[in-house]
Swiss-Prot record:
<keyword id="KW-0808">Transferase</keyword>
<dbReference type="InterPro" id="IPR001451">
    <property type="entry name" value="Hexapep"/>
</dbReference>
<dbReference type="InterPro" id="IPR010137">
    <property type="entry name" value="Lipid_A_LpxA"/>
</dbReference>
<dbReference type="Pfam" id="PF13720">
    <property type="entry name" value="Acetyltransf_11"/>
</dbReference>
<keyword id="KW-0444">Lipid biosynthesis</keyword>
<dbReference type="InterPro" id="IPR037157">
    <property type="entry name" value="Acetyltransf_C_sf"/>
</dbReference>
<comment type="function">
    <text>Involved in the biosynthesis of lipid A, a phosphorylated glycolipid that anchors the lipopolysaccharide to the outer membrane of the cell.</text>
</comment>
<keyword id="KW-0963">Cytoplasm</keyword>
<dbReference type="InterPro" id="IPR029098">
    <property type="entry name" value="Acetyltransf_C"/>
</dbReference>
<dbReference type="GO" id="GO:0005737">
    <property type="term" value="C:cytoplasm"/>
</dbReference>
<dbReference type="InterPro" id="IPR011004">
    <property type="entry name" value="Trimer_LpxA-like_sf"/>
</dbReference>
<comment type="similarity">
    <text>Belongs to the transferase hexapeptide repeat family. LpxA subfamily.</text>
</comment>
<comment type="subunit">
    <text>Homotrimer.</text>
</comment>
<keyword id="KW-0441">Lipid A biosynthesis</keyword>
<keyword id="KW-0443">Lipid metabolism</keyword>
<dbReference type="GO" id="GO:0016020">
    <property type="term" value="C:membrane"/>
</dbReference>
<protein>
    <recommendedName>
        <fullName>Acyl-[acyl-carrier-protein]--UDP-N-acetylglucosamine O-acyltransferase</fullName>
        <ecNumber>2.3.1.129</ecNumber>
    </recommendedName>
</protein>
Length: 264
């Protein structure tokens, strides 16, 4: 453990192997069969257990848990492992779990990856290099992910699925099948279905004006002519309805995004 910077509150079991310039922050827990290669940094409250190896220059943020047993009923305490490569960034609350007898006894992560807050990598997954998993991406067991893949936040991937190289999965996508290399996958996005009439009534908005505003947005989003013309026409037609005027003002503001598509 020479040349390592270890906080006095860290708990490092006898047998753990630390490379040069390893930094271990407050309240980290390192098991006896853990190997941390050169320049690994654990910020604080990081737990690394099991037969686990972390490659050089990897940085792990608070409350991440690496190398714990897989979440499967048939796990029989087999001596499976977790291998993580070099130059990875593993953010807060990420979990990477060990392999199992049914999956080759190893969970493996490559190099130069970014796992954002709350990512879960299940048992026996094989993750390539240069991938980005956004917040709360969840991978079940036995999943293969190719190099340069990007998975959007809150997406979940079914066990045994294969995600090909250079593919991109949009946020909030449930993926239950293989994704081809270079594929672009996304789930149905949120749509505008009307107005929040119940909430508006609870807040004391006039019921007649609320129903009139509902008709107005139907004319804006599904009427004849182009969008700008429809906005202008509706603004003139409902100029005495404060709810409609508030919606029109919002529509006329500059935005970096499109509007939710209207589906009646």
């Amino acid at each position: 453990m020479s040349n390592s910077n270890i906080h006095t509150t860290a708990v490092i079991a006898e047998g753990a192997k630390l490379g040069k310039n390893v930094k271990i922050g407050p309240y980290c827990i390192i098991g006896p069969e853990v190997v941390l290669h050169d320049n690994v940094e654990l910020k604080s409250h990081v737990v690394i257990e099991g037969i686990t190896e972390i490659g050089e220059n990897t940085v792990i943020y608070p409350f991440a848990s690496i190398g714990q047993p897989p979440q499967i009923l048939k796990y029989a305490n087999e001596r499976s492992s977790t291998i993580i490569g070099s130059n990875n960034t593993i953010r807060e609350y990420v979990t990477v779990q060990a392999g199992s007898q049914r999956g080759g006894m190893m969970t493996r992560v490559g190099n130069n990856n970014l796992f954002m807050v709350g990512v879960h990598i299940g048992h026996d997954c094989k993750i390539g290099n240069n991938v980005v998993f956004a917040n709360y991406v969840s991978l079940a067991g036995h999943i293969g992910v190719g190099d340069y893949t990007i998975i959007g936040g809150l997406s979940a991937v079914h066990q045994y699925a294969r995600i090909g190289e250079y593919s991109m999965i949009g946020g909030l996508s449930p993926v239950g099948a293989d994704v081809i290399p270079f594929g672009l996958v996304s789930s149905k996005r949120a749509v505008l279905e009307g107005l929040n009439l119940i909430g508006m009534n609870r807040k004391g908005f006039d019921k007649v004006k609320s129903l009139s505003a509902l008709k107005a947005i139907e004319e804006i989003f599904s009427g004849e002519g182009n969008f700008a013309e429809r906005i202008k026409q509706v603004a003139e037609k409902y100029n005495n309805n404060s709810i409609v005027i508030q919606i029109i003002d919002f529509l006329n503001q500059d935005s970096n995004r499109a509007f939710c598509r209207f589906e009646k």
